[in-house]
Amino acid sequence: MSLISKPGKYLRMYAGMLMRRDPGLIVFGAWLGERFADNSKELFLEAQAREGIRAVWVAKEQAVIDEINSLGFEAYLWGSPEARSIQQRAGYAVISNGISDLEHTYLGGAVILDLWHGVPLKKICYDDRYEKNWDSPKQKIRDFLINIPLGKEYYVATSQTFVPIYQSCFRKNPDHILCLGQPRNDLFFRERPEPYYPGKRVIL
């Protein structure tokens, strides 16, 4: 990214804080915008059955858009005017890997729910000191600038055991760690689960 485009990116993030966001509009993404999968997918499908919610998926691949559209659901291609308009107006954004699951440039002021995609069995993010120097002056400035427009980000932990780990690896206050469950696991707790894979039985 050029030095010219970086200021523009941050300006768009901050401008998003001034826009009126629709609490009934939720934008979803996963795996850096490349897949229709994981916890984001399961919550997206669940949201379709809820009245008063407009759930929209944004992805980089046309094949992903076509797959979602074939199910009768709304999806738009990454970078398109429709996708950017949705992201600028959405009250909530749901992701599974990180803010780059969507065009986070357009998410300033939105509530971001990071469902994550597993449990922290290894050092990740700020706890992974081999990935980068998280405490370098450059990184601290970047974090400061982003945390203002994207500061309403919450992470989902699967149990109280992982709450302090999430606090550390994501550097978030306790009130930004939600001890819930992963949507992709809800299938195993339904009394009468709907066919997840038609013609197949889920055993694990």
Each predicted region: which residue ranges?
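Nucleotide donor/acceptor-binding cores
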Residues: 23-24, 110, 200-203
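A short acidic, often aromatic-flanked loop/helix-cap motif at beta-alpha or helix-coil junctions
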Residues: 64-65, 81-88, 185-187
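A nucleotide-sugar donor-handling region in carbohydrate enzymes
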Residues: 2-12, 121-204
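Extended catalytic core of nucleotide-activated donor transferases of GT-like folds
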Residues: 41-45, 72-137
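A short acidic (Asp/Glu
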Residues: 37-40, 66-70, 104-106, 125, ...
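N-terminal pre-catalytic "stem/leader" segment of glycosyltransferase-like enzymes
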Residues: 1-82
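Hydrophobic/aromatic beta-strand patches that form the interior of the parallel beta-sheet core
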Residues: 56, 76, 94, 111-114, ...
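Helix N-cap/beta->alpha junction signal
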Residues: 61, 97, 158-161
